[in-house]
Curated annotation (Swiss-Prot):
PANTHER family: EXPORTED PROTEIN, EXPORTED PROTEIN-RELATED. Induction: By vancomycin, mediated by VanS/VanR. This is Vancomycin B-type resistance protein VanW. It comes from Enterococcus faecalis (strain ATCC 700802 / V583). It comes from the Bacteria. The lineage of its organism: Bacteria, Bacillati, Bacillota, Bacilli, Lactobacillales. NCBIfam families: vanW-B, vanW-gen.
């Protein structure tokens, strides 16, 4: 039997534990030697590297749609802190360092989130859709991913987008961040906008790129193990030369593993762990 954490045994201690974690979380960033991106550019940089969009509303959660409306409200607050951000050479992007005070003037609403492996509602819930989008955008640039964690559980199918399997990025203030570092001599700029149906992510650069990046799944497997079904998705990145289309480089970035907690289509092949 797994031992319960102290905050699970005594839930009234949770707010104090969360406050403690956040203090240490942000203090750590003050003394980690990184130069964090914080400059907002008034003008858009000239070269568009990549653009993507994703449906805002997911109708497959099994929860009241009010939580989807609340999520969109939360995403709009967060987008205001990110739009136009410049990531200059040598700088590091931290999701939480930028979004930390997004609700300073207007409080977040309750949205869906996963806590202790279970889907629930929480103030500021739904923010992972923003971090997922940004991670997908960053993968299409030369920026170095230095901190990213995937969801260990998928409670419901993802909304329609051009993202492949295994490229999500969960975030939890005080615990889990999304960070990238600019090890190039170019400056990059991110924009996130929302219309009535979609959230749109863009990344621009101050110099003409010499190559583009394509992200694909090397393989996707579904395996029945430990009483559940797990998705194993290999994520590969190809660097393609502009003009010629020649593949300069292709490498496996990582293999993402997560538990699937919703019914898969009958056509999906599910292997047994001992095969």
């Amino acid at each position: 039997m797994n031992r319960k954490r102290l905050t699970q045994r005594f839930p009234f201690l949770l707010p104090m534990r969360q406050a403690q974690r956040k203090i240490c979380f942000y203090a750590g960033m003050r003394f980690d030697g990184c130069c964090y991106a914080q400059t907002i550019g008034e003008k858009t940089l000239p070269y568009l590297l990549f653009e993507t969009d994703c449906a805002l509303y997911n109708h497959n959660t099994g929860f009241d749609m009010i939580y989807q409306e609340n999520k969109v409200f939360n995403l709009k607050l967060a987008a205001k802190t990110l739009n136009g951000l410049l990531i200059k050479p040598g700088e590091t992007f931290s999701f939480w360092r930028l979004v930390r005070h997004a609700d300073k003037d207007t409080p977040y609403k309750d949205g869906l989130t996963v806590a202790n492996g279970k889907l629930t509602t929480m103030s500021g819930g739904g923010m992972c859709q923003m971090s997922n989008l940004l991670f997908w955008v960053f993968l299409h640039t030369p920026l170095t991913i230095i901190q990213r964690s995937g969801h260990v559980v998928k409670e419901f199918p993802e909304p329609n987008s051009d993202e492949i399997k295994g490229v999500d990025a969960t975030i939890s203030e005080g615990w889990i961040d999304l960070k990238v570092r600019n090890d190039t001599d170019c400056t990059y700029q991110i924009w996130v906008t929302l219309d009535d149906e979609k959230i749109i992510g863009q990344v621009f650069a101050d110099k003409q790129p010499q190559a583009l990046y394509k992200i694909a799944n090397g393989s996707i497997q579904y395996v029945r193990e430990s009483g559940g079904i797990y998705e194993y998705a290999k994520v590969e990145r190809m660097q393609v030369a502009l003009g010629t289309g020649e593949i300069i480089d292709c490498k496996l970035l990582y293999t993402n593993k997560c538990k699937i907690c919703y019914p898969l289509p009958e056509s999906v092949d599910i292997q047994e762990a001992n095969q």
